[in-house]
Curated annotation (Swiss-Prot):
HAMAP family: Lumazine_synth. Belongs to the DMRL synthase family. Gene3D superfamilies: Lumazine/riboflavin synthase (3.40.50.960). The keyword Transcription regulation does not apply. The gene is ribH. It catalyses: (2S)-2-hydroxy-3-oxobutyl phosphate + 5-amino-6-(D-ribitylamino)uracil = 6,7-dimethyl-8-(1-D-ribityl)lumazine + phosphate + 2 H2O + H(+). Its EC number is 2.5.1.78. CDD domains: Lumazine_synthase-I (cd09209). Pathway: Cofactor biosynthesis; riboflavin biosynthesis; riboflavin from 2-hydroxy-3-oxobutyl phosphate and 5-amino-6-(D-ribitylamino)uracil: step 1/2. Keywords: Riboflavin biosynthesis, Transferase. This is 6,7-dimethyl-8-ribityllumazine synthase. 5-amino-6-(D-ribitylamino)uracil binds at F27, A58, L59, E60, C87, V88, V89, N120. InterPro entries: LS, LS/RS, LS/RS_sf.
Length: 163
């Protein structure tokens, strides 16, 4: 049975037709545009449809995800995966640490408790230059990375459901 649950690093389990939720924090609009572009490109390439929900900041992302997951389940059209996108830039106070740690913790809790494949694309940086390097699809493409993480976890979930 262990071999049946092992997958190659490049798992190609079909996820086309899946439905994803992207929740984005629009605190830094231009950076967010770049993160969203990367995530959308990855989901679209995999044949995954998506809905986008926009919230004011990173701390609101987990609550919006929980609300959307509940609504989708009640409607009979549950989401198969979730992508969280946002940007937190360090300032002069401990706000950075609070937002970074609490949003990440809440996302992990949601993913584990709800068994939902989730890619965390909330970038945490010291400078605007670091944010741009991480957000642009032509550079580090962290929006794309978050979508790929969600898709990888969805593939694992689907493969293990068949094992």
């Amino acid at each position: 049975m262990a071999d049946a649950r092992r997958a190659p690093l490049k798992d190609r389990t079909d996820v086309s037709g899946a439905r994803a939720l992207i929740v984005e924090a629009r605190f830094y609009d231009d950076i967010q545009d770049a993160l969203l572009e990367g995530a959308v490109a990855e989901l679209s390439a995999a044949g995954v449809s998506y809905d986008v929900v926009t919230v004011p900041g990173a701390l609101e992302i987990p609550a919006a995800i929980a609300i959307a997951l509940d609504a989708a389940e009640r409607s009979g059209k549950p989401y198969d995966a979730v992508v969280a996108l946002g940007c937190v830039v360090r300032g002069d106070t401990i706000h950075f640490e609070i937002v970074s740690m609490e949003s990440s913790r809440a996302l992990m809790d949601l993913s584990v408790q709800r068994r939902v494949p989730l890619g965390n694309g909330i970038i945490t940086v010291n400078t605007d230059a670091q944010a741009w390097a991480r957000a642009r699809a032509s550079e580090l493409n962290k929006g794309g990375d978050a979508a790929r993480a969600a898709l990888t976890m969805l593939r694992i979930k689907r493969r293990l459901a068949k094992a």
